[in-house]
Regions:
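Active-site loop segments of alpha/beta catalytic cores
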Residues: 1-252
Length: 252
C-alpha cells in the first residue's frame, strides 16, 4: 500500500502511513460498553466482579502484546510532534524526532481514560480500570490520563499505577483546587474549560473572571488550556479569538 501510494504521490505530496490512534489508547472501557452496554457494565461491577476484572485484565494484556508486536515489526511512529495526543493535546517535546523504523514504545505518548467510570468509586476505579490499563500504558515513555471525566479523589490511584504519567486531564467538572494540589508539577495540568461559556453566548467580563480564577489556583502548575467540545460558536469566530486573548492575558 505504501509503495503504491508512493508511486502515485511521489513529487506531489509528502505522506506517512501510521497506525490508527485507537491502537495507542489503553482505556478498554469503551470497548466493554460496546460489548455489554453501559447499564449492564454498571451491574457487572456488582454482579460479576471477578469475571469482569478478568476480562479487563485480558484486554489489557492483549493490547500490550499488540503494542510489542508493532514495536518488533517497526510499525510505530514518533508522536512527539504536531500530532493529536491524549485527549486534546499536542505531542511536542524537546526530544529529537525519529524515523518510524527507529521508534520504540518508550519514545511515544500513550493514553487512557475512564469516562465511563465517572460515577464509579475511587476503589472500583482502581480495581477495574487503572490496575488493568497500566499494563499497556506503562509501556510508553510518556502517559496521558483522563478526558471529559472528573478525576477527583482518583489521583492517588493513578500515581500508584501509572509510572510514566506526564499529562493529566482536568475537565470542566473537576475540582480545580484538588487538581492543582494533586498534580502540582508532577505532570502537565491539561485544563479543559467549560465550552458552554462560548457555545451559549459570550460574556467577556465573565470569561475574564473565570480564566483568572483558574490561573490563580493553578499558578504553581504546568498549564495547558484546551478548549474542546465546541459544537457551535454562534456563526462567528470572534468569540474564539477573544477567548485566546483572554486566556493569554490570564495565564501570562
Amino acid at each position: 500500500m505504501q509503495e503504491k501510494a508512493g508511486d502515485v504521490l511521489d513529487g506531489i505530496l509528502d505522506f506517512e502511513f501510521q497506525i490508527p490512534y485507537s491502537v495507542l489508547v489503553q482505556s478498554h472501557l469503551i470497548e466493554m460498553v460496546h460489548l455489554r452496554g453501559l447499564e449492564n457494565l454498571m451491574y457487572d461491577l456488582y454482579d460479576e466482579p471477578e469475571l469482569l476484572n478478568s476480562v479487563f485484565r485480558h484486554m489489557g494484556e492483549s493490547k500490550a502484546r499488540l503494542l510489542k508486536r508493532l514495536e518488533e515489526k517497526r510499525l510505530l511512529f514518533d508522536n512527539r510532534i504536531n500530532i493529536y495526543t491524549g485527549s486534546g493535546s499536542l505531542g511536542y517535546t524537546n526530544a529529537p524526532w525519529k524515523e518510524p523504523e527507529d521508534v520504540k514504545l518508550k519514545d511515544m505518548w500513550g493514553f487512557a481514560d475512564a469516562q465511563e467510570f465517572s460515577n464509579v468509586s475511587p476503589e472500583m476505579f482502581e480495581t477495574f480500570a487503572i490496575a488493568n490499563q497500566k499494563i499497556g500504558l506503562n509501556l510508553f515513555g510518556r502517559g496521558c490520563y483522563g478526558c471529559c471525566e472528573p478525576l477527583d479523589h482518583k489521583y492517588e490511584a493513578i500515581y500508584r499505577h501509572i509510572t510514566n504519567i506526564r499529562r493529566l486531564s482536568v475537565s470542566p467538572w473537576s475540582d480545580i483546587e484538588e487538581a492543582a494540589e494533586q498534580i502540582g508539577q508532577k505532570a502537565i495540568f491539561s485544563w479543559k474549560p467549560d465550552p458552554s461559556k462560548i457555545c451559549t453566548g459570550f460574556d467577556e467580563s465573565e470569561m475574564r473572571k473565570y480564566l483568572k480564577e483558574v490561573a490563580i489556583k493553578t499558578k504553581d502548575c504546568y498549564m495547558e488550556v484546551i478548549l474542546k467540545d465546541i459544537r457551535t460558536c454562534g456563526h462567528t469566530n470572534r468569540h474564539l479569538v477573544k477567548f485566546i486573548e483572554l486566556a493569554r492575558e490570564a495565564f501570562s
